[in-house]
Amino acid sequence: MFIYEPLTGDGARVYRGLRVALEFKKAGDDVRVVFDGSGVEALAGIAHPGDKRHSLLMELGNSVDGACGYCAVAHKVKDQIVGAGFALLDDDDGEVSVRRYVNEGYTVLNF
């Protein structure tokens, strides 16, 4: 599950991405959540306990792999993401590798 959407606007795509991931997790599926592109801003925002989507993030727990390292730096949210305990993913020349997830057998859904 890749979330590319920032929280600007209503944040509905971020919410749906988290809910769909949680649906898979509750069904016993191996689901991974990655925040990429502008979506790194969403992770920085929902990592804050005051955000209304924070509880969904906590329910997903270790299913959240983290955020694109390059994007986190570019969007100036690296410190918030790392400070909240999430990993920066940089396995493709500093960016997160979507190909790795495909090669590991995951179906990639984008929100």
Task: Place the predicted regions along the sequence by residue.
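Histidine-anchored nucleotide/phosphate-binding helix
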Residues: 13-27
